[in-house]
């Protein structure tokens, strides 16, 4: 439950994270590169950002969303015609934070290829489905979970109706977008998200949340 935010998350797996994208900064390894000017060190995620790889890991919340958005905008400014690869391992989180990421994905020029590693639950699953069609992937043992937004409110009785209308509006909006991304009917999406709905990688492909399963790199 919460007081002021509508969320969409798998609550049993939410944990607090200290870094921008949900990765513990104290555990981040460093990479040392040799350049013409000598050695240069990067944390591993900054180095992967040079390869246009972004990690969305952990709970979706405002601080993480702002940094994901900043990385998306930076990579667009660097090369607007090159794809960006968004790796997702998330139990979900804030709907507003997730929609900020989603809107930026649609706003910028580069195609966004989404890849589920581990899990993409709730808002994580929504962002997974929002990648460029034909470029949305799951790894073989990844799990995807879709459901309706979770909400709660504490306050005056007269405000309850206002908040109830808002959460129903958001539920309808998310279902319409999910139907658009998956090719399912709105009625089916509404029915399938009424309760927690877990899907294997194969089921996620069949449902239309992703386009294919990545077993290994093509050049391996």
Swiss-Prot record:
Ranges annotated as spanning the membrane: none
Annotated GO biological process: protein quality control for misfolded or incompletely synthesized proteins
GO cellular component, one term: cytoplasm
Catalytic residue positions: 122, 147
S-adenosyl-L-methionine recorded as keyword: no
Subcellular location field: Cytoplasm
Family the entry assigns: Belongs to the peptidase S14 family.
Purpose: Cleaves peptides in various proteins in a process that requires ATP hydrolysis. Has a chymotrypsin-like activity. Plays a major role in the degradation of misfolded proteins.
Protein name: ATP-dependent Clp protease proteolytic subunit
Species whose genome carries this gene: Colwellia psychrerythraea (strain 34H / ATCC BAA-681) (Vibrio psychroerythus)
Lineage of the organism: Bacteria, Pseudomonadati, Pseudomonadota, Gammaproteobacteria, Alteromonadales
